[in-house]
Amino acid sequence: MKNKRSQNSPYVTPNNPYLTLEKALGYSFKDKRLLEQALTHKSCKLALNNERLEFLGDAVLGLVIGELLYHKFYQYDEGKLSKLRASIVSAHGFTKLAKAIALQDYLRVSSSEEISNGREKPSILSSAFEALMAGVYLEAGLAKVRKIIQNLLNRAYKRLDLEHLFMDYKTALQELTQAQFCVIPTYQLLQEKGPDHHKEFEMALYIQDKMYATAKGKSKKEAEQQCAYQALQKLKEAK
């Protein structure tokens, strides 16, 4: 079992090896065992790992982020709010928030995961972030989680709006497929129709020669982003 912060690190104190993490988070755990559980991946083969906390954290974060978006984007309809939430409540979105507090440096993973750079994997890092937020919820309640998430969103995203996040789907998918399959997705133009001033493009997305999505858009780029969004949802459901 490995923890990246060595005892010689300036970030480690004898009484609290997680002091810097808690400062970045803006919350100090009363029960450090709960914090350690949230940071412990199942690969460690310990009696307590973060899987149960991850389950709770997923529900807590879905509610908190949904509420924040509901109040912030009063002009968005249900469809736009759902797309916006899906881009944040995802492995890519939670990994982005986790890296804002350098959570990867504190994960407890097995030696084999350490060798394969497991602490940087979106699946492991995002799950640990969900577990961490569940721990905060259990100790301090929903209001504290809400405050932490609001702060992290402001730090992790220069612009929190549908257009900006939507344009990040291709990047998110590429990072995920490289981590899971060691390949990047490919896009193919299926159809182009309409006059020059009103073109419509239909694109297909493939991962390892398997078609994952098709979508239409006013440009190839827009259609590719739609494809990437669909593929991300399929991979999330298959997790």
UniProtKB/Swiss-Prot annotation:
Q: What does this protein do?
A: Digests double-stranded RNA. Involved in the processing of primary rRNA transcript to yield the immediate precursors to the large and small rRNAs (23S and 16S). Processes some mRNAs, and tRNAs when they are encoded in the rRNA operon. Processes pre-crRNA and tracrRNA of type II CRISPR loci if present in the organism.
Q: Which PANTHER family match?
A: RIBONUCLEASE 3, RIBONUCLEASE III
Q: Quote the protein name from its UniProt record.
A: Ribonuclease 3
Taxonomy of origin reads: Bacteria, Pseudomonadati, Campylobacterota, Epsilonproteobacteria, Campylobacterales
Cited Gene3D superfamilies: 3.30.160.20, Ribonuclease III domain
Under the heading SMART domains, the entry gives: DSRM, RIBOc
The cellular location(s) given in this protein's UniProt record come to: Cytoplasm
* Pfam families per record: dsrm, Ribonucleas_3_3
Q: By its UniProt entry, which CDD domains does this protein fall under?
A: DSRM_RNAse_III_family, RIBOc
Q: Where does Mg(2+) bind?
A: E54, S127, E130
InterPro entries tied to this protein? dsRBD_dom, RNase_III, RNase_III_dom, RNase_III_sf
